[in-house]
């Protein structure tokens, strides 16, 4: 169970562009490798559900415009007495920068945040010297569609595994600080141990944004 923290909309040419926003007190990142392997899907499920069901609610064609994790914490930065105001502002902005993906359409990005003298402050993108917006967070409508279809396949697979009663310990592993066992609530009952009784970690292949 769960609920959306915030949904932002922008209406343009009869279409409603929606982005899902989640407030985070920690340093949550949008990790495509985790997403592609079936973890951290919540924000995308919200977005694609809105795309599928939203037209009946809003009487508009719904276009998914992205998902963003928004820091919900005070920006505390290290500095010195000689630090300039501009440098201090850059450090603060970096702490408050959103994480996620956004639709790679100039009009949509401008509706989210107009570039100022310092460029784009809060979206997870950059403005290069030529004035073009760049960054791995930019995704085309085609790639969002691919991600939606893949998410649907993952849900179907999860449903089949649940129906089959598959409860085998099969923890993913990307390192000592990024693995399924790190915060697992069932560790006391599971007793998973690499190499014992057939216990094996599941190493995840890295997924690049351009894929």
Give short role names for the model-derived ranges.
Residues 1-211:
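Structural signature of nuclease core domains in nucleic-acid processing machines
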């Amino acid at each position: 169970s769960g609920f959306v923290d915030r949904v932002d909309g922008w209406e343009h040419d009869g279409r409603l562009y929606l982005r899902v926003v989640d407030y985070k007190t920690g340093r949550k990142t949008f990790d495509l490798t985790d997403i592609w392997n079936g973890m951290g899907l919540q924000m995308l499920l919200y977005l694609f559900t809105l795309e599928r069901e939203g037209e009946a609610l809003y009487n508009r064609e719904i276009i998914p415009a992205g998902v963003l994790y928004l820091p919900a914490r005070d920006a505390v930065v290290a500095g010195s007495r000689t630090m300039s105001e501009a440098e201090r502002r850059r450090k603060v902005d970096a702490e408050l920068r959103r994480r996620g993906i956004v639709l790679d359409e100039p009009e949509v990005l401008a509706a989210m945040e107009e570039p100022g003298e310092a460029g784009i402050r809060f979206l997870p993108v950059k403005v290069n010297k030529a004035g073009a917006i760049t960054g791995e967070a930019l995704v085309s409508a085609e790639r969002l569609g691919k991600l939606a279809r893949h998410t649907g396949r993952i849900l179907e697979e999860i449903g089949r595994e649940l129906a089959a009663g598959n409860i085998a310990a099969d923890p993913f592993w990307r390192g000592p600080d990024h693995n399924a066992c790190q915060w697992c609530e069932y560790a006391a009952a599971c007793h998973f141990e690499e190499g014992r009784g057939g216990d094996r970690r599941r190493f995840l292949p890295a997924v690049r944004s351009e894929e």
